[in-house]
């Protein structure tokens, strides 16, 4: 037998002790049968106790949830102060469009409009039950994307019953209150304008309501200097309202458009184009039908068919005109602003005066900005009250003349385009006077060159004490260059060229074209009456009228000489 080292004996003893401790610990963790029974009873008791304790708590939580107050509604015009916050808004869906990503609902309340993006998956329509015209309650987070406000939608509920009625009533009350313009004075004392002051207020209300309803406003105006002045005045008033109403930076290009009328009337060609565009926008972008504002157009039979087409689709319509109307045409507009409809026979009133006053009612903030426009709209003999207004605004007579001539020249080129920015620079940027003077100088040079060409070719004839200056526009004008026939005849008549060569106190200028005669007088020559008389005298010429006072007489090319003789005779007898 060997001898055991004391150190080794100590290690072995320690290992033995450790093993015994481990075995005892394992035994402690092995439950006995009695332990199992006791533990089961304890677990069952605990479970029962837990159930009895949980049910009242859950009920209490549910009751608390039910009694929790509803989230407060936020007004849309306050969202700029609540970026990154959770909000609830209520309003009307005024537009819905599907992008390659989310569905974007344009929601309007009584204060403003905002885009709300809802996403289920890329390109898939979210909340298909919600459409334009529905009233909704929407919860989401306000975000700023590309410097524009947008609500990221968490939940959207289409409102029905009392909830819908509450929101609809709230919005309608706000619309009625906000859309009606305040009592605004006219720009100046003018009897003819005062006669239609109520109509101007009504027209302003229609325009303001359209903006608040997110309904596009389309201004269609005659492509003359006067028409441009009136259309630009309305544009100047509406654009700030659109910017205030819509958060998107490009809203002014979607919700307002100004389109010149090349032919001067709102005929079927113009109406067909507009209706095609509006139906396409409604189908593709869920847009509301626009409000059409016809300026220096929409009063004569030439516009009847176009207005009737808009009426079929129930597109709202406003007409603003200073020209003599045909019977019944004004009834096709929701609001017609024309002093002749109220028995005021003022041929010296321009549509620019009406347009500037309408603009001041649509948006009182632009009153000073448009106060010089009435003076700009007169080619000669502008009323003193309007020249005084222009002087007060810093526009002297030379400046207003330059503006008028510059706009007349630009109206001729690209006549179907609105030229928004250029017209704005000319009419409203006072510091850019040199631009107006430069373009106005071009106007005068081109006009004088053409007058030098045509004056030797003017013919003068008389009938029944009336002198006629006749220009064969087919033979002696550059028909496709500036100035157009209308501008040229206006200047010939203002200067009374040829009048000295004929006897008679009455003077009429005629532009004798291939198949029509344009009339310029003191406003007393009604083309419809003249056409009716001339048709009896030249029954094979196919004579008809286009327009009313100082309008045009149309005829067959092969009977142009007979038509001219008949028209001269008819006018002279009427005067």
Identify the residue ranges that each predicted region occupies.
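N-terminal accessory regions of nucleic-acid-interacting proteins
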Residues: 33, 40-41, 55-56, 61-63, ...
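Short, Lys/Arg- and Gly-enriched loop/turn segments at beta-strand edges
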Residues: 100-103, 143-152
């Amino acid at each position: 037998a060997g001898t055991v080292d004391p150190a080794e004996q100590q290690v072995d003893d320690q290992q033995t002790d450790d093993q015994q401790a481990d075995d005892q610990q394992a035994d402690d963790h092995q439950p006995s049968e009695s332990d199992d029974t006791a533990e089961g009873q304890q677990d069952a008791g605990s479970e029962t106790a837990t159930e009895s304790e949980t049910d009242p708590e859950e009920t209490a939580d549910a009751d608390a949830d039910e009694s929790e107050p509803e989230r407060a509604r936020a007004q849309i015009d306050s969202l700029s102060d609540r970026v990154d916050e959770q909000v609830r808004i209520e309003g009307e869906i005024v537009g819905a469009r599907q992008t390659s990503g989310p569905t974007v609902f344009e929601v309007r309340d009584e204060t403003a409009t905002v885009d709300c993006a809802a996403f289920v998956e890329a390109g898939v329509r979210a909340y298909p039950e919600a459409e334009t015209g529905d009233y909704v309650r929407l919860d989401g987070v306000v975000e700023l994307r590309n410097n524009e406000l947008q609500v990221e939608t968490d939940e959207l509920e289409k409102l029905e019953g009392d909830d819908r009625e509450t929101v609809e009533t709230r919005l309608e009350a706000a619309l009625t209150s906000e859309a009606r313009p305040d009592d605004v004075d006219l720009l100046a004392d003018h009897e003819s304008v005062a006669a239609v002051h109520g109509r101007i207020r009504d027209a302003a209300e229609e325009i303001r309501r359209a903006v608040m309803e997110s309904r596009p406003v389309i201004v269609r105006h005659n492509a003359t200097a006067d028409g441009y002045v009136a259309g630009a005045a309305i544009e100047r008033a509406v654009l700030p309202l659109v910017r205030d109403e819509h958060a998107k930076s490009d809203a002014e290009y979607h919700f307002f458009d100004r389109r010149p009328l090349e032919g001067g009337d709102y005929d079927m060609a113009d109406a067909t184009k507009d209706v095609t565009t509006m139906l396409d926008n409604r189908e593709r972008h869920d847009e509301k039908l626009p409000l059409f504002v016809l300026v220096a157009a929409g009063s004569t039979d030439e516009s009847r068919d176009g207005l009737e087409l808009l009426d079929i689709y129930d597109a709202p319509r406003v007409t603003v005109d200073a020209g003599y109307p045909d019977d019944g045409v004004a009834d096709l507009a929701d609001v017609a602003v024309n002093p002749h409809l109220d028995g005021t026979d003022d041929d010296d009133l321009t549509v620019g005066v009406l347009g500037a006053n309408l603009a001041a009612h649509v948006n009182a903030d632009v009153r000073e900005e448009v106060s010089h426009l009435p003076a700009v709209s007169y080619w000669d003999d502008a009323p003193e009250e309007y020249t005084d207004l222009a002087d007060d605004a810093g526009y002297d007579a030379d400046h207003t003349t330059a503006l008028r001539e510059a706009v007349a020249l630009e109206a001729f080129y690209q006549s179907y385009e609105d030229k928004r920015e250029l017209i704005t620079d000319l009419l409203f940027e006072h510091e850019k006077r040199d631009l107006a003077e430069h373009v106005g100088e071009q106007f005068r040079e081109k006009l004088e060159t053409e007058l030098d060409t045509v004056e030797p070719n003017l013919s003068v004839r008389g009938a029944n004490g009336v002198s006629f200056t006749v220009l064969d526009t087919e033979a002696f004008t550059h028909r496709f260059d500036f100035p157009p026939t209308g501008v040229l005849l206006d200047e010939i008549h203002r200067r009374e060229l040829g009048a000295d060569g004929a006897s008679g106190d009455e003077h009429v200028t005629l532009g004798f074209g291939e198949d029509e005669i344009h009339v310029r007088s003191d406003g007393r020559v009604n083309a419809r009456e003249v056409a009716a008389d001339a048709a009896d005298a030249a029954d094979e010429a196919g004579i008809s009228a286009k327009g009313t006072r100082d309008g045009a007489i149309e005829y067959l090319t092969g009977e142009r000489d007979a038509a001219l003789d008949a028209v001269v005779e008819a006018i002279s007898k009427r005067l």
